[in-house]
């Protein structure tokens, strides 16, 4: 089902996007890191958890059994489409979806025990402001954990596509590489410390995943879901084919028995309020 994403999400304003395609493009990888994010935020029984940029609700889904029936998990996202998807996936679970800008959260100070943000912070126009909001809504002693993508070469499923597209669309280079904008662990650490967090740690974390085939990898890109595939749809048909073939050539080194297997590195930053 296609829905319209609101402005500010890493999809073009007013563009119809299939949330399930987004899950196939990014979700299959992001969920590999969610257990480490929840552990860094010490999500546990009776906890009040805020999942910022909840997307299709994967982090919230994994947090719910950790907090139990006496806890609560709120999922905030600026995208109506993503909230619709998350609400449908988690209906009846105790999940509370809220339409919200991560840079201006509609919650009282000290409302939560833990705040997590999985692959959302790098798309904030002002990520430092967002981290400041995370600190504001956390109680004293509460925990934050954010996960962002490392450098393009350490996230080849996204990095190669962004690099190839940037040669065809040089005017969009900044947009294409926005996914990697918080790749510097020192910058992420400084941001957390600057927001008032203590015991800050930023750890490089790697997971390996796979696609059944190159076609399995490529199919969500054709839907234009996410900041990088959106740009792909701007190209003429001949250029799209050229991009596809070059990306396929680059990723061939990850192919084994027809499947694409590759590692992705992300940074997990955490701290105590």
Language-model segments: which ranges?
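Conserved Class I S-adenosyl-L-methionine
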Residues: 2-15, 29-30, 56-58, 178-273
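Class I SAM-dependent methyltransferase Rossmann-like catalytic core
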Residues: 16-27
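Conserved alpha-helix/loop element of class I SAM-dependent methyltransferases that forms part
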Residues: 28-47, 62
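Class I SAM-dependent methyltransferase SAM/SAH-binding core
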Residues: 48-105, 114, 129
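A short SAM/SAH-binding and catalytic strip from SAM-dependent methyltransferases
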Residues: 113-127, 150
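Conserved catalytic/acceptor-binding region of the Class I
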Residues: 128-129, 135, 139-212
């Amino acid at each position: 089902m296609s829905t319209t994403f609101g402005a500010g999400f890493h999809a073009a304003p007013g563009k119809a996007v299939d949330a399930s395609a987004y899950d196939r493009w990014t979700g299959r990888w992001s969920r590999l890191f969610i257990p480490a994010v929840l552990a860094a935020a010490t999500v546990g029984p009776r906890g009040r958890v805020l999942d910022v940029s909840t997307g299709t609700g994967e982090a919230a889904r994994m947090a719910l059994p950790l907090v139990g029936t006496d806890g609560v998990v709120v999922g905030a996202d600026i995208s109506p489409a993503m909230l619709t998807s998350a609400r449908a996936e988690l209906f009846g679970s105790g999940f509370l979806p809220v339409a919200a800008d991560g840079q201006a959260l509609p919650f009282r100070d000290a409302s939560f025990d833990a705040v997590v943000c999985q692959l959302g912070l790098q798309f904030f126009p002002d990520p430092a402001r967002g981290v400041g909001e995370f600190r504001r809504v956390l109680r004293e002693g509460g925990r934050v954990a954010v996960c962002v993508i490392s450098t393009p070469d350490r996230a080849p499923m996204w990095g190669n596509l962004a690099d190839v597209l940037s040669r065809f669309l040089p005017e969009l280079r900044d947009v294409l590489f926005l996914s990697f904008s918080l790749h510097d662990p020192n910058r992420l650490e400084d941001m957390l410390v600057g927001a008032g967090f203590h015991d800050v740690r930023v750890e490089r974390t790697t997971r390996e995943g796979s696609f059944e085939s190159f076609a399995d990898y490529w199919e969500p890109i054709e839907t234009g879901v996410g900041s990088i595939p959106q740009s792909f749809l701007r190209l003429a048909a001949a250029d799209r084919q050229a991009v596809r073939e070059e990306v396929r050539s680059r990723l061939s080194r990850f192919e084994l028995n027809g499947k694409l297997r590759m590692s992705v590195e992300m940074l997990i930053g955490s701290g105590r309020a």
